[in-house]
Curated annotation (Swiss-Prot):
Naturally occurring in which organism (per UniProt): Stenotrophomonas maltophilia (strain R551-3)
Protein name, as recorded: S-adenosylmethionine synthase
Top-level division of the source organism's lineage: Bacteria
Taxonomic lineage of the native organism: Bacteria, Pseudomonadati, Pseudomonadota, Gammaproteobacteria, Lysobacterales
GO CC annotations, alphabetized: cytoplasm
Annotated residues for binding of L-methionine: E56, Q99, D241, K272
Cofactor(s) listed: Mg(2+); K(+)
Region listing for Flexible loop, in residue ranges: 99-109
Sites where the protein binds K(+): E43
Subcellular localization(s) per the UniProt record: Cytoplasm
């Protein structure tokens, strides 16, 4: 019998790196609301008393970057010097420039379907049937823990009013013969107000944050709980650590279970294949698994800057495929257009839906329909997390001739 442990972690929306991610994606959303053809590469750094927003942006839109940055910080919960960071009074430094015209000449085409990739690179997508979200269980549970922390913290008349925005989670699972059998260890560290006793904090976190999230069937007498194991966690957020866009790429994806091409997501418009192709690869892998072609599937795509067609598409199902990996790859090429324009059209990506992806994972979330007013004052309907749909599973299964 095969037995092993696997661990994944997540961080809350108040973690400094995630504050930076959310600011970068808020800038992207504000621009896409007015200009769907914009080119955006926005990076943010947050540290004590200041947010620095930099990058390369080419757009016809105008946004109030300072007000936008402050709103994101305050909405997260950094709204007072008592918390250590105040979005209303912190400095905001704008260091945004224009994108190189040499990149534009390689990406833009007269025919939109011939649009070239915004950069070279390799991207991975992954899916597994071990959870309803088609995500690895450890990262799924880690996300839900810090999501619950924020939910309780922001709740009106919260029973845990002393919670602060910064938090981290970690879940270690035991696998028996490739299937989750138990939770071996849980780590939950949360920033808190001064004066809370460690004993009270541990009890409250277990009851209000951990218990509602973790499946009882996987808990046992030997499960280890590490709640604020260092003791006090009063200094957090951008005061405790410098935050940067793009530093939580494993949290953003599959918690270390699948491979990663190295490119971050936040602050990048859909012409950047670092983001859009990673979303497309997840969409492909999820539909392959949802179709029953495999229990696990990892898809890799790669691109050359200025070139529309992917330089490679490869698939592995780790021995779980119901048909060969070669046949699955042929089906992928037939059913999915993985050129940059094809991805943007397939997933309808040129809409302001990215700030909500910047915390609690870009994958494993439910597709969410929404509407917004564009720059012309017209109402536009769109779907966030469109890459989580399984709308091509039936066609894949039929074409694979599986009963």
């Amino acid at each position: 019998m095969s037995s092993y442990l696997f661990t994944s972690e997540s961080v809350s929306e108040g973690h400094p790196d995630k504050v930076a991610d959310q600011i970068s994606d808020a800038v992207l959303d504000a621009i896409l609301t007015q200009d769907q053809r914009a080119r955006v590469a926005c990076e943010t750094m947050v540290k004590t008393g200041v947010a620095i927003v930099a990058g390369e942006i080419t757009t016809s839109a105008w946004i109030d970057l300072e007000a936008l940055t402050r709103k994101v910080i305050v909405d997260i919960g950094y709204d007072s010097s008592d918390v250590g960071f105040d979005g209303a009074t912190c400095g905001v430094l704008n260091l945004i420039g224009k994108q190189s015209p040499h990149i534009a000449q390689g990406v833009d085409r007269k025919k939109p379907e011939e649009m070239g990739a915004g950069d070279q690179g390799l991207m991975f997508g992954y899916a597994t049937n071990e959870t309803d979200s088609y995500m690895p269980a450890a990262i799924h549970l880690s996300h839900r823990l810090v999501e619950q922390q924020a939910k309780i913290r922001k709740k009106k008349n919260s029973p845990l009013s002393w919670l602060r925005p910064d938090a981290k989670s970690q879940v270690t699972l035991r696998y028996e013969n490739g299937v989750v059998s138990a939770i071996d260890a849980v780590v939950l560290s949360t920033q808190h107000a001064p004066g809370i006793k460690q004993k009270d904090l541990i009890e409250a976190v277990r009851e209000e944050i951990i218990k509602p999230v973790l499946p009882a069937k996987w808990l046992h007498k030997g499960t280890k709980f590490h709640i604020n194991p260092t003791g006090k966690f009063e200094i957090g957020g951008p005061v405790g650590d410098c935050g940067l866009t793009g530093r939580k790429i494993i949290v953003d994806t599959y918690g270390g279970w699948a491979r990663h091409g190295g490119g971050a997501f936040s602050g990048k418009d859909p012409s950047k294949v670092d983001r859009s192709a990673a979303y497309a690869a997840r969409y492909v892998a999820k539909n392959v698994v949802a179709a029953g072609l495999a229990d696990r599937c990892e898809v890799q795509v790669s691109y050359a800057i200025g070139v529309a067609e992917p330089t490679s598409i490869s698939v592995t199902t780790f021995g779980t495929g119901k048909i060969s990996d070669d046949k699955i790859e042929k089906l992928i090429r037939k059913h999915f257009d993985l050129r940059p324009y094809g991805i943007i059209k397939m997933l309808d990506l040129v809409h302001p839906m990215y700030q909500q992806t910047a915390a609690y994972g870009h994958f494993g979330r439910k597709p969410k329909e929404f509407s917004y007013l564009n720059g012309e004052g017209e109402t536009v309907n769109a779907t966030a997390f469109s890459w989580e749909k399984t709308d091509r599973a039936a066609a894949l299964r039929a074409d694979a001739k599986l009963k």
